[in-house]
Design a protein with these regions (language model features):
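S-adenosylmethionine
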Residues: 39, 74-76, 80-217
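SAM-dependent Rossmann-like transferase core, predominantly class I methyltransferases
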Residues: 2-73, 82-89, 112
Length: 217
């Protein structure tokens, strides 16, 4: 049998940093670089005992919310996604990892359902693929939900919205960790007054940024 589906869909299983997650066609296959930064306790991130609240935007399968719960054992996690179908997958993963008491799953558009809530840490792996790249996806990527990839003409429409709203939802010493793919040059040109920190991972250079609340102008 020949198929262009990702192997993770056929097996209903994907791993980040060795941690297993259930996946199917309702979510993209998780492959975020943020997982490594959480697992290794990157030096710029707050200490585990300093984080009591984490927000995971565009949670998809819930993998980053769950990894955050492991990395920050005292924290309550809020995981938001626009897709009710994706949240059903996340709910299964949260239950399988025994995190139902610590991770709240919320349906909504980015910060919209959160009111005035503030968080010590915001994580997000939002859609960031530009329109041209989405149009030329190979078959295995076309099997994934396009809503989880498509970031507008230059790929950064949703990232810009996150930057615009993040400060209002960060606690005084809070920060945001956001994956953006290859859009670093565009983003730095758009925000010349913001000093982005671009941590590298084993498989990426300059594809994730870190900003503290004080970095926002």
């Amino acid at each position: 049998i020949t198929t262009c589906k990702p192997a993770s869909y056929l097996l209903n299983k994907a791993y980040i940093q060795g941690v297993p997650f259930y996946v199917d066609e309702r979510v993209i296959v998780p492959r975020s670089y943020i997982g490594e930064l959480l697992a290794t306790g990157a030096e710029f991130l707050p200490a585990p005992d300093a984080v009591r609240s984490v927000l995971d935007l565009c949670t998809g399968s819930g993998c980053l919310a769950i990894l955050a719960a492991y990395a920050y054992p005292e924290a309550e996690i809020c995981a938001v996604d626009l897709s009710a179908a994706a949240l059903d997958v996340a709910r299964r993963n949260v239950a399988e990892h025994g995190m139902s008491e610590r991770i709240a799953l919320v349906e909504g558009d980015l910060f919209a359902p959160l009111g005035a809530r503030k968080f010590d840490l915001i994580l997000t792996n939002p859609p960031y693929v530009d329109a041209e790249a989405v149009a030329s996806f190979p078959p295995e990527y076309r099997a994934e939900p396009v809503i989880a990839h498509a970031g507008g003409k230059d790929g950064l429409d949703i990232v810009r919205r996150i930057i615009a709203g993040a400060k209002a939802h960060l606690a005084p010493r809070g920060g945001v960790l956001c994956e953006i793919g290859t859009g670093r040059d565009i983003l730095e040109a758009d925000y010349p007054d913001i000093a982005f920190l671009w941590p590298d991972t084993e498989e990426s250079e300059g594809e994730v940024f870190w900003l503290t609340r004080e970095d926002f102008v």
